[in-house]
Each structure stands twice: as C-alpha cells, then as structure tokens.
Amino acid sequence: MQVFLKATHFDFIGRRKPAIYASLFLIGVSLVSLFTQGLNFGIDFAGGTLIQVRFEKPMDLAPVRQAIAPLDLGDTVVQSFGTPEEVLIRVEKQGADNAAQQAIVSGVLDALKPIAGEHGVEMRRVEYVGPQVGEELTEKGMLAMLYAMVAILIYISFRFELRFALGAVLALVHDVVLTMGFFSVLQKEFTLVVVAALLTVVGYSLNDTIVVYDRIREEMKRMKRQPLATIINEAVNRTLSRTLITSLTTVLVLIALFVLGGAVIHDFALTLLFGVGIGTYSSIFVASPLVLLMDPGSRRKVAAETAEETP
C-alpha cells in the first residue's frame, strides 16, 4: 500500500462538495433519530441493580447468563470482575422498595446455585443504581465530551491557528454526532463503555487531523505562492498513505476484538470500528476543506465559484 499511495495526486478539495453534502445528510439523519427515538440507555444511565458474586472455582460467563435469563430482569450485563471466580451481574430491573430489591437478589442467587455445585455461591456486593444516579452519569458523560472539545480548541489555537482549531473541533463534532446517531438508529445499548469508546474516537480522530494539519502548515511555508486549495491537496496526498495504513491496522485489531473479545467488549469494539472509519473520513474530507472555507480569501473565491455555477 505504501508503494501505491506514495505519490498520489487526488483532487480532494475539488471533490469536497459531494463529501460535504453526504456529511450533512448523515448528520441530519442522526439528529432526527436522536431527537425522535433518542438513545437506548443502558443500566449505567437508566438505573438498575448490580450484584457481585463469588464462586469457589473459575466460572464461565455463558452458564451464568443462561441461568438468570428466565428471571425476566430486563437488560442484563454479566462480566468477570478481578478474578475468574468473581462475577459482576448488572440487571435493568429495580425494586420499588427494600423487599422487592431483596427479592431480585435472592432470585439471582437461587438461579446460580445449580451451576455453582456443592460449594455454592457467595454474594459479595449489592448496589442499586436509581434514576437520579443515571441522570447524573448522563450529565457527567456529556460534560466530559464538552470539556474535551474546549481543551482541544484551546490547544490547537495555540499550536496552529484559530481556523485550524475550529476546523478540528467541527470535524470532531461531526464524528461524535454520527457515532451517536449510529447507536440511535440501530437502538444499540448506550452505556459508560460506549462513552469511553466515544472519547477514544475523539482522540484517534484528532490525532489523524493534527497529522494532516501539521503537513498543511509545512506546505504553506514551502509553497507560499500557491493557492491554499493546492497546498491542502498536496498535504492530504502526502499524508494519505500514513492515514490509510494506520486506520487499516487499527481496524484489523478492532475486528479481532469484536469477534473474539466476547460480550463485555463487543460494544466498545463496535463503537471504535465505526468511529475510526468516520474519523479517517473526516480528517480527509471534513477537517481539511473547513480550513479552506475559514480562510477569508478562499471564502471569497468559493463564493465566486458558486455564483458562476448558478444559472
């Protein structure tokens, strides 16, 4: 791939309009879905019951899931916790009072006894996540992304220029909105794990964008007499092989995680798979054209070209 992409001369800026229209369409679909059917919040945000148990021997998670499935506890997450003997069970169902909560815990323990063997199962911890806690986690998750965006805006403003910073932040907003829209359209469960993956996507996409922006800045010094559109095209083409090879190797690892990682890491890997693809696209077709659009001279030229195309 390095050989084939070493000296590419694609006109990315000349083809920016179809990419912009595609992005606007996908953002529109995402926003409509987010505002109409919203996100399918998991136990972390919607509330539920958390039960930590210990078996005397290492326990496979599949029998645990099968044992508690008939209890009708809503969305259920089962994962190892620390050691193979420790299992963490999170269920959507909440008790209206203490008696109902105890009934849920007792039902889970009774369901696990047949698979625990003669040594039985020991309850180590029980926590109840109410709706108020879920709302607090939602607020903190959104604030974490907002603070990340502000910090990125400040950093790139100092590192490059304000137009680069605005382009990077808008590209990141593009990535986050499309990823959240993906979860909303498919009604995939949205948990704290997905929020962590979203922040990882932001970091990955930003890294791709900064590599392109750094090359644009270097080309601006080297090609002082050239139009900005030509400079951006040259910079994107020079970084194209690095961008695609990095994304490809990352995707291969994520596919392995998605296929082999099990149910616990499934949503994390899925979020990153989608986010890395969108982030690679945005660093080439969104972040770079935004630098052109935010340049005063280029804006006037773009406006003139648009006027000439209009009959």
UniProtKB/Swiss-Prot annotation:
Disulfide topology: none
Parts of the chain that traverse the membrane: 19-39, 142-162, 166-186, 192-212, 245-265, 272-292
Subcellular location as annotated: Cell inner membrane
Main location per the UniProt record: membrane
GO cellular component, one term: plasma membrane
Topology of the protein relative to the lipid bilayer: Multi-pass membrane protein
Subunit structure: Forms a complex with SecD. Part of the essential Sec protein translocation apparatus which comprises SecA, SecYEG and auxiliary proteins SecDF-YajC and YidC.
Family (UniProt): Belongs to the SecD/SecF family. SecF subfamily.
Name of the protein this chain belongs to: Protein translocase subunit SecF
